[in-house]
């Protein structure tokens, strides 16, 4: 695929039967043995993902904490060393520039993990807002490879090849300089599947050996490589949002039910705070809802949501859920139609199929929260 970027793991995909697609400008595997098989593997056993296309940036210096707080909606002050925080980075109108993870190494040292499709935009946004803050910002994306190992058996398998007790790495905590198969890595108990698991950051030159080592360690348990197809169905079932679907620069965190990650009472100002305070006071005019399709069909991103002949919103993500075995979706609709139990139609091609609003927590997470 001419002109596309590759990750350090590009050479291993075909070994495992990977089918390659263009994703965010990268050659990446959409599936290996089939996305349904891979989806169930992560839900029941453990699966390994190449997520080296994600972006990473280091923010260091005397004002690092203050600067991060200025950029982010969540309360950075609560972060202790070696902890991870999920947050939004918004524009002045409260629209989402990106959702990202903030890793705190020390008071003057933070590590940001950003979405692949937003990598260049995010780094530019961060640098453009440096102002008088005493910080240094470095895009380290090309010097890091990232693997995600997810599923109920992930800890048991990974424990075989690491030099630390993984039970000591609690949910949304991290440990640096962990030896994984003898290679120095950063390991965090984080993920994007709704299952317990780890994200492993390593040197690009170590990625292939780590990939093989992890899959070999989990051979008896049935660990498998997982592609982008299952990554999306897994995150969707767990109601984890995807940038470009559930959020963008015109959608605020409050509209998609993510107010928990917007700390409007923090003393410090952050970009978009005033707009979000105003929106919270006035109330949102649209909301993200879960829905189940009652007629036969599959809802897809962009399909219109219709009530009494009027378009009231659009589907952000929809699938036939592999775990729940029914057609469900997320939709951004006018607020007055967001109540659970509300019936509406989804326009699937030329048909208007019946649907009903349901709780958007489709799947109960099995992450270790303590």
From Swiss-Prot:
GO terms classed as biological process: glycine decarboxylation via glycine cleavage system
ATP-binding found in the keyword field: no
Catalytic activity: N(6)-[(R)-S(8)-aminomethyldihydrolipoyl]-L-lysyl-[protein] + (6S)-5,6,7,8-tetrahydrofolate = N(6)-[(R)-dihydrolipoyl]-L-lysyl-[protein] + (6R)-5,10-methylene-5,6,7,8-tetrahydrofolate + NH4(+)
UniProt keyword list: Aminotransferase, Transferase
Enzyme Commission (EC) number: 2.1.2.10
Gene3D superfamilies reported for this sequence: Aminomethyltransferase beta-barrel domains, Aminomethyltransferase fragment, Probable tRNA modification gtpase trme, domain 1
Lineage: superkingdom: Bacteria
Stored InterPro entries: GCS_T, GCS_T_bac, GCST_C, GCV_T_N, GcvT/YgfZ/DmdA, GcvT/YgfZ_C, TrmE/GcvT_dom1
Gene Ontology molecular function terms on file: aminomethyltransferase activity; transaminase activity
CC annotations in GO: cytosol; glycine cleavage complex
Enzymatic class: transferase
Pfam family, one: GCV_T_C
Keyword hit for Transferase: yes
HAMAP family in alphabetical order: GcvT
Similarity comment: Belongs to the GcvT family.
Quaternary assembly: The glycine cleavage system is composed of four proteins: P, T, L and H.
Primary role: The glycine cleavage system catalyzes the degradation of glycine.
The name this protein goes by in its record: Aminomethyltransferase
Lineage: Bacteria, Bacillati, Bacillota, Clostridia, Eubacteriales
